[in-house]
Amino acid sequence: MASFFSFLLGEKKKTANVAKERLQIILAHERSGRNSHEPDYLPALQRDLIAVIAKYININPNDIKLNLERQENLDVLEVKIELPDK
């Protein structure tokens, strides 16, 4: 209830609380960026794609390449599949 009145009355946050919030934001940003080059799900996604494509086409698993690139605020997943000759 006190925080509600603080909000209404415009009580300023203490410097320690502001610093703590900023640190939490920085840590969250660093943690999310740590594995941004290759997320944990990428190898599993590649295995699943190989399994699905293998149902329809006889393909070498090495002929499927996944690449994740970051372009500004956009993640782009590129999938290259080298299909066998008929």
Curated annotation (Swiss-Prot):
* Key words, A-Z: Cell cycle, Cell division
- Cell cycle: present as a keyword of the record? yes
Alphabetized InterPro entries for the sequence: MinE (IPR005527), MinE_sf (IPR036707)
| UniProt record, GO biological process | cell division; regulation of division septum assembly
Lineage: superkingdom: Bacteria
According to its UniProt entry, what is the function of this protein?
Answer: Prevents the cell division inhibition by proteins MinC and MinD at internal division sites while permitting inhibition at polar sites. This ensures cell division at the proper site by restricting the formation of a division septum at the midpoint of the long axis of the cell.
Q: Which family is annotated?
A: Belongs to the MinE family.
What's the protein here called? Cell division topological specificity factor
Q: Which organism is it from?
A: Polaromonas naphthalenivorans (strain CJ2)
Q: Please name the taxonomic classification of the source.
A: Bacteria, Pseudomonadati, Pseudomonadota, Betaproteobacteria, Burkholderiales
